[in-house]
Amino acid sequence: MTEQPTTTPSALKRAAREFGELTAVADGDVRLTFTQLHDRVRDFAAALSSQDVRPGDHVAVWSPNTYHWVVAALGIHYAGATLVPINTRYTATEALDILERTKTTALVVAGNFLGTDRYASLRDESSTFDLPTVVRVPVDGGDAELPGVFDFDDFLALADEDTRAEADARAAAVSPDDVSDVMFTSGTTGRSKGVMSAHRQSVGIAQAWGECAEVTSDDNYLIINPFFHTFGYKAGFLVCLLNGATVVPMAVFDVPKVMATVHDEQITVLPGAPTIFQSILDHPDRPKYDLSSLRVAITGAAAVPVALVERMQSELSFDAVLTAYGQTEAVVVTMCRTDDDPVTVSTTSGRAIPGMEVRIGDQGEILVRGENVMLGYLDDPESTAKTIDADGWLHTGDVGTLDDRGYVDITDRLKDMYISGGFNVYPAEVENALARLDGVAESAVIGVPDERMGEVGRAYVVAKPGVTLAEDDVVAFCKERLANFKVPRSVRFVDSLPRNPSGKVMKNVLREEKK
């Protein structure tokens, strides 16, 4: 293979050259080879040029996982513009805030999807909302024609010989240090921040991920993680672009559909939160599907019990189960390798990927430094300076340990720690104990006010199907395994835990409900 590319346009050109007739994207009935993907991306970039979108402009995508997202994102880059992904769970108010803050000049937006017309919601939210270029993605169908709004295929048809030549010139001019995207943090506390990354970083992350997971052109890569999140984008379809693997996007998570897709598409790589794999393992229809093609799983965002790793390997035929750690500000920091044993995978988040350093700072905070640390927050130098110190160390806000091998164990978030009777309590320690209680599918622990202790723990517990647990059972189990100040004083049984798109539990939501 030729020298590694450092921009997504150069990665696309290399993929078309080296993997040409292999399948790049398999989205239902739509099958695109790498050559066809290149041509559609080029046409999308040419169409942007025809609409006066300039290099450096911000272009947003607010749409679920379909092949259109891949074409649009790479087309935005090919045109020299900056991609702004928008969370499909966002309300029109939240989306408008991002569009305004980024001064977006064009928007790619889903039509009717899960009962919502996102473009209509934007117009309803603001009577002054107006963008010069809006491209609508057909998802559920039945979209009425709207003046000034291009349907996706009609937009591609705007490309002509002159605009394609302009697009090629812009793609060739993209620099490794140009901003490739502005990814907004989940905003679980306060206002979300726009994280800026360079092309070399986005491509470098995908390269490291692909190397650790040993992704090749023989792989079929099911992407359930949203494209608007780094897990679906930089650790998703960009990995496939670099390695010639096939992207199989899934717009809505559904366990039977996941199993059917693994069966039909011979999926080999399946990234996702631990709950995805637990749901597959526990589903009564699992024996109906042939899941033997599965080769590697990459997970994280929550504790991964050793028993789950072992079941994934013995019952789902995974040759390797990997965990990884990162955040929007440094997408992939550490990652396990395919030869790591189940205990290492379960108890750590791997070791630093090439180009990254990790050390433990004050209060056990994990600090990271290296090539893939963000350029900074959009229009927010003050927050950037607070997050990245003068020596270039990114302060993650995560608490953890580093063993002699360089493997990281993420124990908690600094902000999730609470103080009970003068003692620091890290909820993840309690949650790890609860994971060993028979009948517990998952749990989340927060601190709640207490007159005598200051704060005490409250556990939110999701029981496994068909299992009945009592509060006394949970408390008694913890008392046998934890110091008294760590034992939850109350337990709430819930059907599910609130999660952000990366699969992390949104404890701020639980705190709002604590009364």
Swiss-Prot record:
Molecular-function GO terms, alphabetical: ATP binding; medium-chain fatty acid-CoA ligase activity
Catalytic reactions of this protein: 3-[(3aS,4S,7aS)-7a-methyl-1,5-dioxo-octahydro-1H-inden-4-yl]propanoate + ATP + CoA = 3-[(3aS,4S,7aS)-7a-methyl-1,5-dioxo-octahydro-1H-inden-4-yl]propanoyl-CoA + AMP + diphosphate
Disruption phenotype: Cells lacking this gene completely degrade cholesterol to half the yield of wild-type and accumulate HIP.
Pfam families named among the record's database cross-references: AMP-binding (PF00501), AMP-binding_C (PF13193)
SUPFAM superfamilies: Acetyl-CoA synthetase-like
Source species, domain of life: Bacteria
Entry keywords, A to Z: ATP-binding, Cholesterol metabolism, Ligase, Lipid metabolism, Nucleotide-binding, Steroid metabolism, Sterol metabolism
Gene3D superfamilies attached to this UniProt entry: 3.30.300.30, N-terminal domain of ligase-like
Membrane-traversing stretches: none
Enzyme class: ligase
Positions contributing to ATP binding: 185-193, 398, 413, 504
InterPro entries: AMP-bd_C (IPR025110), AMP-bd_C_sf (IPR045851), AMP-binding_CS (IPR020845), AMP-dep_synth/lig_dom (IPR000873), ANL_N_sf (IPR042099)
GO biological process annotation, one example: fatty acid metabolic process
EC code: 6.2.1.41
Disulfide bonds listed in the record: none
Keyword flag Transferase: no
Job description of the protein: Involved in the catabolism of the rings C and D of cholesterol. Catalyzes the ATP-dependent CoA thioesterification of 3aalpha-H-4alpha(3'-propanoate)-7abeta-methylhexahydro-1,5-indanedione (HIP).
Family named by the database record: Belongs to the ATP-dependent AMP-binding enzyme family.
Protein name in the entry: 3-[(3aS,4S,7aS)-7a-methyl-1,5-dioxo-octahydro-1H-inden-4-yl]propanoyl:CoA ligase
Phylogenetic lineage: Bacteria, Bacillati, Actinomycetota, Actinomycetes, Mycobacteriales
Originating gene: fadD3
